[in-house]
């Protein structure tokens, strides 16, 4: 019922493809009659939610276990959804993950892993012929359920670690003349593509399928930015653009201190609307190869149907207009007014969209430039900041601009696994009454508050007088993004 209610909205707002992510390490969600163990075991976890599974050992259990939580779609239910979507002129594209994100399969069929043991590997063993027998049997049943042009095979985030030490994978590489594990993955993707093509279907995969060489007729779904899709299109392959910083609906959409816990990033309605998936600057040879744009909702942190709707709507309206509207016809103010009307319409019909009209918007502290003694002054970094969290460079701490909600907004400096020692040089002796700095914590981004901040002053940059040490009272287990000013006030 939930899926069909979302399909109703997709049809209303002209979203014409439903990409159904049916398998992942956290659970197998489609009935495969040849392999009942997939829905007897791999679809169930002895934890109440994804959090418990992810941090509690990533185990599975039988469906009759008293602690079992999970489920799957029967083949009859899938046929019902596919037909419901067809009547709305929506094509349903299934995804069966391979070779990575396959912990749930390998827990049930450990012989398909490189180690031969459950709970060791997350990738299928590509050197094992049984792997291809299993995948082709699964895909045959999937093809029988979904009449879609494309079958999505995942292809993302394979660890490839097991392949590096696996005798079977080594033998496969020697036999096929493959020089590294990237080419080994490419071999698998090409072989699966040949199987799908023989069944009259086309292969679609995440942009990692570019690694090691792209299969001849593959279509790339670009999520790690736009580079993968552009590279595929330039090489004559079709691409679907879904870069995470514009299209990932599991990202927080407003003040993270009041919104539900979300993935470790930030995406506002306005940012989603600002995306142009096929700008003319890409060139006449590339633009026609870009098929469209897609919004993605990953549900690790989304435990209920109401929460899912809160994350999808109204940002999916922005995705729809990005796909259908020429850039020169887009007007965010006009769109925003219509989005508010749509939110009211959805609420009247029992949906649970984000209440856009009451959005906090940008972090208030980030809106007004700060003028103080340190503005524009030199910072001496005795501990270099990480290139991964470089903000706007050396002047970031004294440019007067405070960070927003998003650690990736080029205003937050970060350090990896080290204490930090730095000096703000005021250039001359001056009276100081307050010293302060903002810090943030993002549990799912592995960004943490300092244990403590020590403030000291010096006349010569050699001998420092401690003023105060301010401790941190936010536990590392706190999952909500949070922000805190550490400061000293005195004379």
Where in the sequence are the language-model features?
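Substrate-binding cleft of carbohydrate-active enzyme catalytic domains
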Residues: 2-201
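Flexible loop/turn segments at secondary-structure boundaries
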Residues: 25-31, 99-105, 152, 158-163, ...
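Substrate-binding groove of N-acetylhexosamine-processing glycoside hydrolases
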Residues: 80, 89, 132-150, 171-382
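Core-facing hydrophobic residues within beta-strands of well-ordered domains
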Residues: 290, 430-432, 450, 483
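Disordered, acidic Ser/Thr/Pro-rich linker "stalks" and the adjacent N-terminal cap
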Residues: 362-429, 440-449, 469-480
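Short beta-strand elements bearing conserved aromatic residues within extracellular beta-rich modules
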Residues: 453-455
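Noncatalytic modules at the cell exterior or secretory-pathway interfaces
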Residues: 489-491
